[in-house]
C-alpha cells in the first residue's frame, strides 16, 4: 500500500493534465479511428468508460474528504484499465494492425512515466494484459485466434525493460539527492545549536551586567570599567559567533546539490588555532565537561581547507564522545602530529567504545546507532569534509574501553594540496585595475599560467560599473594609476563597499595616507615586490587566511545637522535594532512596517533617507519605491537604500528598475551601514 501511495504522490502534480488528456483523448480518437482512418474494430462504450474514469481524476480534489484516502488505489485502477488493458485489448481485436502496435508502444511509454515504481508498473502490466486477453476471448465468443506478429514482442520487451531500467536509475539518483538534502537540512538545524547556544550565553552575560530596573528605577545607571570591558568582549564574541554561523550555513548549503563539500572558501589555516578554538567554543552541557578535554600539540602544522568545517568535525567528535561516555572519569585527549609525509589530529576517549559490526558502518550516509539524541551531520559528513581537504578519517575502538578517531591531512606542499589549489584557482576571479602596461602584461602572463579568470579595467571603466559588478575573489588596484587629488580613490572606494573580495592597494614608494574612512581595510603591497614574486604573492592573497589586516573602528557619522532616516522593515527585531544603532549616531529615526505605511509617513514627515526592506507584506519595497519616485511630491527624490538579504541578479534588476538609489545586503555590519549612509547624506 505504501508503494501505491508513493506512485500517486509522485504523479499528483501532473494528474490534472493527465485527467484532461484521457477525458478528451479517448472520445476524440474514436472519431479518428472510426471515421477519419477507419480500423477493423472500435468500441465507443469502452472509450466512454475510460473517459469517465479519467474524469474522476480531474474531479479528485472535489471529492468528499472521507473518500480521498481511496484516491491512490483509484489511480492504480485507472492506469491499469486505461493503459495496458485498453490498448492491448484493442491490439488483439484489431489483429495486431500496425496502428495499434504503435498505439500500444505509446501506451507503454506513458505508463512508465506515470508509474515510477517498477514493481507496481509490472504488476499493472501483467494484470492489464491478462484482463485484456480475457475480455477479447469473451468478445470473440469464447474463442481467440492469436495472429500475432512475434517480431513485435522483442520491441515491446526492450521498451519495458530498458525504459524502466533508465527511469529507475534516474529515480534512484533523484531520491538520493532528496535524502541528502533532508539529511543536510536536519543537520544544519541541529549544528546551529552551537552558535545559538553561544549567543544565548552572551545575552545571559549581558543581562547579568546591566542594571535591573525592577530593583529600583533611576535616571542614570553607572557601569564599572570592568563591566564595560566585559560587555565589549561578550559583544565581540557574539559577532564572531554570528559570522561563524552564517559561514557555516553557506558552506553546508553548497554541499547539498553535489553530495560533496564545496571547496570554494578553502584557505591555509593553522590546525592548532582551529582545534583550540573548537575546544573553547564547543557547547558543553556541563561546565565541568570543558576540563575533560586535553590538547597535546607535539608538532604544529597548517592545512588547506575551511576552519569552520574542521571545527564542526571536532564538534561532532566531541559530541559523540560525550554522548557515549561510560564513567565519571571520562576524558577526551586530542593529539597533533606532523611529519614530512602527513599531518594528523587524533581524538581519543575512554567511553563505551564501538562494536566491530557497527564500526564498519559509522561513516556510511544516513547510518545511526539508534540511540536517542544521536542526530546532526554525523560521521558521514566528517568523512566528506576530510576527503575534501585531501585527507581522510578512520576509527579504531575497543568495546567498553576506548575509541580513537584519526584525521589525516596532506602537507601543504604535497601533490594532493597542489591539485586542490590548481582546481580552485581555475574558479577564482581577479580584477586588476591599472593603466601601466608592464603591470597589465605581468598579471596577464600569470593568469595564463595559474589559469584564474582575469578582468583588467582602467580607472574610467571601473567608475562606470555598479557596486554589484565587483563580485571577485581578489581586487588589485594600482594606486599610481589613480589621480593624486584623491577624487578617483574616493569614487572607487565607494563602489567597493559591497564586495566580499580581498582588496589590495599596490604602491611604488609608500602607502598613501587616507583621510576618508571606508568600510574595508585594504592590504598594501609594494609594486616592485609584487613584480619580483607575482605568482607567490597572488597565491598567498588567495589562500593564506592569516594574510589579513585588523578591522578599523567605525567612524561616527557626521550628525551635527540632525537628519531623519526612515527604517522600513516588517522584521520588528531588525527594525528596532537598526533604529537604535542610528539613534546612537544622533539621527532621528522613523520606523514603519511596510511600504504603504512608509508612504503615509512621508506625507507627514520630512525624511532625508529611507532604508527599505524588499520583501514585505501589504506593499513591498520595490512597489513602494516606484510609487515614491512616481509621485510629484517633495519626497520623490529622497535617497532610498534597499536593505535586502537577496543579492541575486533578478533582485538587483528589480532594485534598479524601481528607482532605488543604492542597496546594502543583510546582514551588514555597522561600518558598512554607516559608510553607505554617509555616501547619501
From Swiss-Prot:
It is a multi-pass membrane protein. This is CAI-1 autoinducer sensor kinase/phosphatase CqsS. It holds the Pfam family Response_reg. InterPro entries: CheY-like_superfamily, HATPase_C_sf, His_kinase_dom, HisK_dim/P_dom, HisK_dim/P_sf, Sig_transdc_His_kin-like_C, Sig_transdc_resp-reg_receiver. Senses the quorum-sensing autoinducer CAI-1 ((S)-3-hydroxytridecan-4-one) which probably functions as an intragenus signal. The sensory signal is then relayed to LuxU and LuxO. The chain crosses the membrane at residues 17-37, 73-93, 112-132, 148-168. GO terms for cellular component: plasma membrane. Keywords: ATP-binding, Cell membrane, Hydrolase, Kinase, Membrane, Nucleotide-binding, Phosphoprotein, Protein phosphatase, Transferase, Transmembrane, Transmembrane helix. Its main location: membrane. Disulfide bonds: none annotated. Residues 187-413 form the Histidine kinase domain. One of its GO terms (molecular function) is phosphorelay sensor kinase activity. The lineage of its organism: Bacteria, Pseudomonadati, Pseudomonadota, Gammaproteobacteria, Vibrionales. The gene is cqsS.
Amino acid at each position: 500500500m505504501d508503494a501505491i501511495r508513493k506512485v500517486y504522490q509522485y504523479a499528483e502534480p501532473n494528474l490534472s493534465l493527465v485527467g484532461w488528456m484521457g477525458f478528451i483523448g479517448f472520445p476524440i480518437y474514436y472519431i479518428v479511428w472510426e471515421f477519419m482512418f477507419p480500423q477493423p474494430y472500435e468500441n465507443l462504450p469502452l472509450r466512454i468508460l475510460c473517459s469517465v474514469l479519467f474524469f474522476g481524476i480531474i474531479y479528485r480534489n472535489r471529492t468528499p474528504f472521507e473518500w480521498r484516502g481511496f484516491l491512490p488505489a483509484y489511480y492504480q485502477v485507472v492506469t491499469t484499465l486505461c493503459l495496458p488493458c485498453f490498448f492491448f485489448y484493442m491490439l488483439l481485436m484489431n489483429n495486431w494492425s500496425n496502428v495499434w502496435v504503435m498505439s500500444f508502444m505509446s501506451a507503454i511509454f506513458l505508463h512508465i512515466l506515470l508509474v515510477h515504481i517498477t514493481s507496481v508498473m509490472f504488476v499493472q502490466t501483467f494484470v492489464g494484459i491478462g484482463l485484456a486477453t480475457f475480455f477479447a476471448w469473451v468478445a470473440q465468443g469464447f474463442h481467440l485466434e492469436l495472429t500475432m506478429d512475434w517480431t513485435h514482442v522483442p520491441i515491446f520487451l526492450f521498451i519495458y525493460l530498458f525504459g524502466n531500467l533508465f527511469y529507475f536509475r534516474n529515480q534512484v539518483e533523484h531520491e538520493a539527492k532528496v535524502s541528502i538534502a533532508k539529511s543536510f537540512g536536519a543537520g544544519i538545524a541541529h549544528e546551529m545549536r552551537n552558535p545559538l547556544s553561544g549567543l544565548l550565553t552572551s545575552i545571559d552575560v549581558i543581562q547579568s551586567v546591566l542594571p535591573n530596573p525592577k530593583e529600583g528605577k533611576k535616571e542614570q545607571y553607572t557601569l564599572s570599567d570592568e563591566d564595560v570591558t566585559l560587555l565589549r568582549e561578550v559583544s565581540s564574541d557574539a559577532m564572531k559567533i554570528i559570522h561563524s554561523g552564517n559561514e557555516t550555513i553557506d558552506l553546508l548549503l553548497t554541499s547539498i546539490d553535489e553530495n560533496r563539500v564545496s571547496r570554494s572558501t578553502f584557505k591555509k589555516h593553522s590546525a592548532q588555532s582551529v582545534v583550540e578554538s573548537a575546544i573553547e567554543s564547543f557547547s558543553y552541557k556541563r561546565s565541568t565537561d570543558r576540563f575533560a578535554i586535553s590538547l597535546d600539540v607535539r608538532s604544529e602544522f597548517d592545512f588547506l581547507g575551511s576552519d569552520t568545517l574542521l571545527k564542526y568535525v571536532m564538534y561532532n567528535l566531541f559530541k559523540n564522545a560525550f554522548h557515549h561516555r561510560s564513567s565519571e572519569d571520562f576524558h577526551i585527549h586530542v593529539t597533533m602530529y606532523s611529519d614530512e609525509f602527513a599531518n594528523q589530529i587524533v581524538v581519543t576517549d575512554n567511553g563505551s567504545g564501538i562494536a566491530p559490526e557497527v564500526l564498519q558502518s559509522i561513516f556510511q550516509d544516513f547510518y545511526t546507532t539508534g540511540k536517542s539524541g544521536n542526530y546532526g551531520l554525523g560521521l558521514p559528513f566528517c568523512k566528506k569534509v576530510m576527503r575534501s581537504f585531501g585527507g581522510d578519517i578512520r576509527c579504531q575502538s575497543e568495546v567498553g574501553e576506548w575509541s580513537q578517531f584519526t584525521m589525516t591531512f596532506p602537507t601543504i606542499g604535497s601533490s594532493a594540496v597542489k591539485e586542490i589549489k590548481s582546481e580552485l584557482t581555475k574558479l577564482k576571479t581577479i580584477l586588476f585595475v591599472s593603466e601601466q602596461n608592464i603591470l597589465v602584461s605581468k598579471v596577464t602572463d600569470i593568469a595564463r599560467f595559474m589559469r584564474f579568470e582575469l578582468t583588467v579595467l582602467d580607472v574610467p571603466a571601473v567608475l562606470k560599473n555598479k557596486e554589484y559588478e565587483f563580485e571577485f575573489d581578489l581586487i588589485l588596484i594600482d594606486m599610481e594609476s589613480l589621480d593624486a587629488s584623491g577624487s578617483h580613490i574616493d569614487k572607487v572606494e565607494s563602489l567597493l563597499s559591497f564586495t566580499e573580495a580581498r582588496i589590495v592597494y599596490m604602491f611604488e614608494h609608500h602607502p598613501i595616507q587616507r583621510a576618508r574612512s571606508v568600510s574595508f581595510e585594504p592590504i598594501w603591497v609594494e609594486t616592485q615586490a609584487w613584480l619580483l614574486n607575482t605568482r607567490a604573492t597572488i597565491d598567498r592573497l588567495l589562500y593564506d587566511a592569516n594574510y589579513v589586516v585588523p578591522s578599523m573602528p567605525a567612524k561616527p557619522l557626521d550628525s551635527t545637522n540632525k537628519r531623519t532616516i526612515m527604517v522600513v522593515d516588517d522584521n520588528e527585531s531588525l527594525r528596532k535594532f537598526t533604529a537604535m544603532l542610528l539613534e546612537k549616531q544622533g539621527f532621528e529615526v522613523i520606523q514603519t512596517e511596510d511600504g504603504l505605511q512608509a508612504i503615509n509617513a512621508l506625507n507627514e514627515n520630512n525624511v532625508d533617507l529611507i532604508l527599505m526592506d524588499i520583501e514585505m507584506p501589504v506593499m513591498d519595497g520595490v512597489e513602494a519605491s516606484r510609487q515614491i519616485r512616481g509621485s510629484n511630491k517633495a519626497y520623490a527624490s529622497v535617497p532610498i537604500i534597499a536593505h535586502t538579504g537577496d543579492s541575486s541578479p533578478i533582485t538587483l534588476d528589480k532594485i534598479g528598475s524601481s528607482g532605488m538609489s543604492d542597496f546594502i545586503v543583510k546582514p551588514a555590519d555597522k561600518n558598512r551601514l554607516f559608510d553607505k549612509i554617509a555616501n547619501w547624506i
